[in-house]
């Protein structure tokens, strides 16, 4: 017998699903049944999601100014709303919590129409479009990097971004500095969808690195499917041992055994780097509408745990110079690793579960905020 059912709404990319996965583990440990509602794009990331059931509803992103494209997207979202309403009416969840992105809009609106309590979790330092639309309509807002003030201060709780159990396990691995002649593990990734820019910039930077330093490198690089073979061939030509793939199921463990990371600065990425505690070169995605990745990066770079390099500045020469500096400064990297860890929030899943449980039990949000204060 469970305490009741909690419905999580997350989709689009792995970045939205990963914190939902972490919350699902915590809620199940507390005796709740957990279901996931997602869209077709996110199904490939949801294979190991710890839910009692996974439901797919139609969804679309409004990312075009073309009137026909907007009309098609709205029609798909309407279909998703009707499907979500039927689903929620049958499941009767205690709470529906959304993790951002357009796929969360149909289930959150359907839940509200049916009188089911709703919560949103905003991972980024800048609230995304879907969550901005939902914010005035939900009972509570949880923030990863959000400031506690603002228009919705009375219903906002800063919980941090939940990280998966694999990340918490990886955080138990101490940082190991790499001295002269020792192997130097470099991890390169661009979020769940990869980063094409890294597939060009990183091999080019390593090509102009001096031979002694290059011989120390051991690389894990996430690359898009269309780039993976080319990147792998470049490293083979340079005689640098490298694992190159569109996806690594053990990325947390690879980060834990690394000396340095090069990555985008999505909210999940920054949160995981903080919990594990690894020095990083963060390259914010330059085309984000709200520049949220730049704001996320500041959360860890401000503590001294990362260096932020705009993509326009990430030339092979700049990156090669950074690699040379860091590979010859193990004490500096060790200090950065400690600084990164100080920015981490390993307790975030528990704090978010506290919020969801408070709402599920019909308690006033002020009771939770008073406890946190």
Swiss-Prot record:
Predominant location category? membrane
InterPro entries for this protein: GlcNAc_MurG (IPR006009), Glyco_trans_28_C (IPR007235), GlycoTrans_28_N (IPR004276)
UniProt binding sites for UDP-N-acetyl-alpha-D-glucosamine: 13-15, 124, 164, 192, 293
A single Gene Ontology CC annotation of this entry is: plasma membrane
Q: Which GO terms describe its molecular function?
A: UDP-N-acetyl-D-glucosamine:N-acetylmuramoyl-L-alanyl-D-glutamyl-meso-2,6-diaminopimelyl-D-alanyl-D-alanine-diphosphoundecaprenol 4-beta-N-acetylglucosaminlytransferase activity; undecaprenyldiphospho-muramoylpentapeptide beta-N-acetylglucosaminyltransferase activity
Q: Where in the cell is it found?
A: Cell inner membrane
Report any Pfam family annotated for this entry. Glyco_tran_28_C
Q: Can you state which reaction this protein catalyses?
A: di-trans,octa-cis-undecaprenyl diphospho-N-acetyl-alpha-D-muramoyl-L-alanyl-D-glutamyl-meso-2,6-diaminopimeloyl-D-alanyl-D-alanine + UDP-N-acetyl-alpha-D-glucosamine = di-trans,octa-cis-undecaprenyl diphospho-[N-acetyl-alpha-D-glucosaminyl-(1->4)]-N-acetyl-alpha-D-muramoyl-L-alanyl-D-glutamyl-meso-2,6-diaminopimeloyl-D-alanyl-D-alanine + UDP + H(+)
Membrane topology listed for this record: Peripheral membrane protein
Recorded E.C. number(s)? Answer: 2.4.1.227
**Top-level EC class:** transferase
Cite the entry's keywords alphabetically.
Cell cycle, Cell division, Cell inner membrane, Cell membrane, Cell shape, Cell wall biogenesis/degradation, Glycosyltransferase, Membrane, Peptidoglycan synthesis, Transferase
Q: Which GO terms describe its biological process?
A: carbohydrate metabolic process; cell division; cell wall organization; lipid glycosylation; peptidoglycan biosynthetic process; regulation of cell shape
Pathway terms, separated by semicolons: Cell wall biogenesis; peptidoglycan biosynthesis
Q: Provide the function of this protein.
A: Cell wall formation. Catalyzes the transfer of a GlcNAc subunit on undecaprenyl-pyrophosphoryl-MurNAc-pentapeptide (lipid intermediate I) to form undecaprenyl-pyrophosphoryl-MurNAc-(pentapeptide)GlcNAc (lipid intermediate II).
Say which family it is in. Belongs to the glycosyltransferase 28 family. MurG subfamily.
Entries under HAMAP family matching the protein: MurG
Q: What is the designated name of this protein?
A: UDP-N-acetylglucosamine--N-acetylmuramyl-(pentapeptide) pyrophosphoryl-undecaprenol N-acetylglucosamine transferase
Q: What organism, scientifically named, is this protein from?
A: Allorhizobium ampelinum (strain ATCC BAA-846 / DSM 112012 / S4) (Agrobacterium vitis (strain S4))
